[in-house]
Amino acid sequence: MTLIQAILLGIIQGLTEFLPISSTAHLRIIPALAGWEDPGAAFTAIIQIGTLGAVMLYFRRDILSIVKSVATGLWKGNPLHDGEAKMGWMIAAGTLPIVAFGLLFKHEIETTLRSLYWISGALIILALVLSLAEWKIKKRLEEGHPLKSMEDIGWKEALLIGLAQAIALIPGSSRSGTTITGGLLLNLSRETAARFSFLLSLPAVFAAGAFELYKTWDLITADPGNIMNLAVATITSGIVGYLSIAFLLNYLKSHTTSIFIAYRLAAGAGLLLLLGGGTILP
């Protein structure tokens, strides 16, 4: 991998990690189109630490408040004593499904499911489910029913959105895409669904990145070029990711996710055509 490739992959990761279009799909598709080697699941997991940093920086006040409140609640023997403490436990609960499924299906995630056929199918299927979620939200608003805010997220919402996050282990699904879709199906507002999605990503992305970094440390440090490429890609993804978070939260205040649905359908169909025509290999 060249330094230019590392920078481009970092930009791709930062742009697509938080938009519901799948960063893993793009990190798999674009190298295939460009004739580069597949960067691999480990590379993808490690550079996500950059986008993890973007979430921590953007939501730093929320995170500090949640951590402080959870600690206070534990000290006082009342874990759910306020909204911030409750949110901390909802994030913890929502993380359980992806941990369980990630450990159970780790081999398949890193091999079989990285096939471009799986990715194209995931792009299309989630677009259809997200379209259904948007229809449900539109109908609810037309009937005059309110949408849920962060304060309304309870155990049921946290666990179900956590299950949606576990589906994102299938490359092409999009972690933000599945969790935002899950939130919309549970009647969260678009902005609330996105905000909870980003906060929910923290434990899972940190754990995956740290694990892959530990597992591949000897391989990475064996070549100074590997260290440089990973560092550059990670930093680039963090900078671009921060801008993507700001964009999406602002965008969803007054827009639906229709543009992302259309993009996913076009990308999935286009990928199938390229595979069918032999332009790229699965």
Curated annotation (Swiss-Prot):
Its EC number is 3.6.1.27. It comes from the Bacteria. Pfam families: BacA. Keywords: Antibiotic resistance, Cell inner membrane, Cell membrane, Cell shape, Cell wall biogenesis/degradation, Hydrolase, Membrane, Peptidoglycan synthesis, Transmembrane, Transmembrane helix. It is found in: Cell inner membrane. One of its GO terms (biological process) is regulation of cell shape. It is a multi-pass membrane protein. GO terms for cellular component: plasma membrane. It catalyses: di-trans,octa-cis-undecaprenyl diphosphate + H2O = di-trans,octa-cis-undecaprenyl phosphate + phosphate + H(+). The chain crosses the membrane at residues 1-21, 39-59, 85-105, 115-135, 153-173, 193-213, 229-249, 259-279. One of its GO terms (molecular function) is undecaprenyl-diphosphatase activity. Catalyzes the dephosphorylation of undecaprenyl diphosphate (UPP). Confers resistance to bacitracin. Bacitracin is thought to be involved in the inhibition of peptidoglycan synthesis by sequestering undecaprenyl diphosphate, thereby reducing the pool of lipid carrier available. Belongs to the UppP family. This is Undecaprenyl-diphosphatase.
